[in-house]
């Protein structure tokens, strides 16, 4: 859309037939060669077909971010969670653009806990830029939190599913980020 606006063209002038099916999950958010295809179509006055092989697609993207996550959870003996804390460190590659925000939003989202503290840090490193895949940023942070919940359930001798249900967010629960 942005490319069409820049060129003062109507969206109706553009026809896109995506070959991939399913949701975006982050992988379809990146603009690859579309601006080039649009310019070639303008210059030639003909439709331009853009096809990327799987190899080209993977070369055009980047890796998911490396992360270092620290999660602390406090609870009563009956399994009521009293506090949750997370320190999330996400690599962004050579340029700032990691999915740290969604990681912070999702880390404790399923739970109704009054005391939550989340710190997030994005670190620029000498690696390729990261790309979005499969719920960008969420799997890394959620895996850390859910692993700690499993450990706590074992220590408390509570069924892990019952432990989660006991502390689950319900309609009207305010998220940690507001």
Name each model-derived stretch.
Residues 3, 7-178:
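Structural alpha/beta core scaffold segments of enzyme domains
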């Amino acid at each position: 859309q942005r490319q069409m606006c820049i060129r003062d063209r109507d969206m109706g002038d553009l026809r896109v037939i995506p070959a991939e099916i399913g949701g975006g999950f982050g992988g379809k958010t990146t603009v690859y060669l579309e601006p080039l295809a649009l310019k070639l179509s303008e210059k030639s006055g003909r439709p331009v077909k853009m096809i990327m092989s799987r190899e080209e697609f993977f070369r055009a993207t980047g890796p998911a971010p490396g992360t270092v996550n620290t999660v602390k959870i406090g609870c009563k003996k009956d399994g009521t969670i009293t506090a949750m804390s997370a320190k999330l460190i996400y690599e962004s590659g050579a340029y700032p653009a990691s999915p740290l925000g969604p990681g912070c939003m999702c880390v404790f989202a399923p739970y109704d806990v009054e005391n939550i503290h989340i710190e997030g840090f994005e670190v620029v490193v000498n690696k390729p830029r990261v790309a979005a895949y499969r719920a960008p940023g969420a799997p890394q942070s959620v895996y850390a939190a859910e692993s700690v919940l499993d450990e706590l359930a074992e220590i408390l001798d509570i069924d892990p599913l019952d432990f989660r249900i006991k502390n689950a967010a319900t309609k009207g629960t305010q998220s940690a980020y507001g």
